Amino acid sequence: MNSQGKTDEAFALAKVALQCDMKSHVCWHVYGLLYRAVKNFEEAIKAYKFALRLEPESAQIQRDLALLQIQMRDYQGYIISRRSMLQARSGLRQSWTALAVAHHLAGDLAEAERVLTAYEETLKNPPSKTDFENSEAVMYKNSLIAEQGNIEKALEHLTSAGKHNLDRLAVLELRATYLAKLERKEEAIKAYRALIDRNSEYKKYYDGLIEAMGLAATDHMARKAVYDEFAEKYPRCDAARRLPLDFLEGTYLIGPIYA
């Protein structure tokens, strides 16, 4: 009835059903669905919670409640829901990841990392090197470590857990970023040069290299020399020729590459 635009009649019928059986989790769940349909999310959450008290094992009600909680940014409530869903289906990696994300959204990065570590400790056999889901989980955990400000630990984790990661480019980019933040200058320079060798058209790599080299924004000639090097190394590279035009002016533009 609600899908046919008869919202008032649908609510009236749901209330009649509740009067007939106040302890029916199905009636309360449907009541919550009706409130969600009219975007009254607070009342929908109340109805879902009541339905869940009547039927704590209902995965569908728990899932609907969790979706509304995250939509309403009720992070603590979302954590409780995700923990319940994890206890019900602890064998699924997505249950652990979802709980970690809940803690992440609530601002508790350390607990989010702990949840992912706890899942790793439940594994009897190491994941396959071709397991894409595991690769993504490793990178997510690495981002949590880095967001906590522990760059040294993040680099160590990237080197160990990420060495077989399927997204090799992401690993190389993060490694260069971490080395630069740790002020390991020579290693950072080498890492960014390797990235430019992979893709000489990406501006971010040049920016990272110049920053790692410690070149001042006003040192136009030194910065130009970096671009000249790669313009000569990769004759068909447009970025190495174009990017210096963002800061060069006057006589600095004169030369074999820019003439």
Question: What are the residue ranges of the model-derived segments?
Answer:
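Conserved structural position within tetratricopeptide repeats
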Residues: 15-19, 49-53, 83-87, 121, ...
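Short coil turns that delineate tetratricopeptide repeat
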Residues: 22, 56, 90, 124, ...
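Canonical tetratricopeptide repeat
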Residues: 30, 64, 98, 140, ...
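Position-specific recognition of the canonical hydrophobic site in helix A of tetratricopeptide repeat
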Residues: 2, 29, 33-36, 63, ...
